[in-house]
């Protein structure tokens, strides 16, 4: 059994004129939400073995904050450029290729791809939108990430910052 947790980056700052999309930092809400969502995961004992993030500043910062809160070693956080504005097919390829022996893999990315990826992986659930810093976790009855297939996951968790005000 494998567990995949998808995390959309926390809320980012759009206020800097001329800011390149790749370089957008987290805003105050994002800086608050990322550690809070990590604490929720920790309270449910959902600590990943490996994390893979888009290298865009907002995604990588979210991943780094969550890694620190979840006490995941920095060596277990990997960046992959294919996750920046990735399609579901791109994300599937990254997970299959880089999941390795992780029993619980956490992937950080962007909309719309990450919401679409969650929906295409789920055998039964559909979410309209994975909000910023939202977390979607599914379980897969596979022994190897290379066997991950569409519509094969059973939703285990769906949470987001405004779910518990």
Enumerate the predicted regions with their spans:
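Charged phosphate-binding loop/patch that engages nucleotide di/tri-phosphates or the phosphate backbone
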Residues: 154-165
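Active-site-proximal alpha-helix that buttresses catalytic centers in soluble enzyme cores
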Residues: 2-83, 90, 127-128, 165
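Domain-level recognition of soluble alpha/beta enzyme cores
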Residues: 125-156
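A glycine-rich beta-strand to alpha-helix segment
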Residues: 102-118, 122
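Glycine-rich phosphate-binding loop signature in dinucleotide/nucleotide-binding domains
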Residues: 44-46, 98-103
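Residue-level preference for the first positions of well-ordered beta-strands
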Residues: 4, 103-106, 135
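Short, glycine/serine-rich, charged loops/turns that create anion-binding
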Residues: 11, 56, 112, 142, ...
């Amino acid at each position: 059994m494998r567990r995949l947790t998808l995390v959309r980056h926390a809320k980012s700052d759009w206020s800097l004129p001329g800011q390149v999309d790749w370089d957008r930092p987290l805003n105050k809400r994002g800086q608050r939400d990322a550690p809070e969502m990590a604490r929720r995961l920790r309270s449910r004992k959902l600590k990943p073995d490996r994390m893979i993030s888009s290298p865009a500043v907002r995604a990588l910062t979210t991943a780094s904050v969550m890694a620190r809160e979840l006490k995941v070693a920095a060596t277990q956080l990997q960046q992959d450029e294919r996750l920046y504005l990735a399609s579901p097919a791109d994300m599937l390829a990254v997970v299959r290729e880089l999941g390795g022996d992780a029993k619980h893999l956490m992937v950080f990315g962007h909309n719309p791809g990450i919401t679409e990826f969650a929906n295409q992986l789920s055998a039964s659930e559909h979410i309209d939108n994975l909000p910023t810093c939202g977390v979607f976790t599914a379980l897969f009855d596979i022994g190897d990430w290379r066997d991950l297939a569409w519509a094969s996951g059973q939703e285990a968790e769906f949470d987001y910052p405004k779910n518990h005000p």
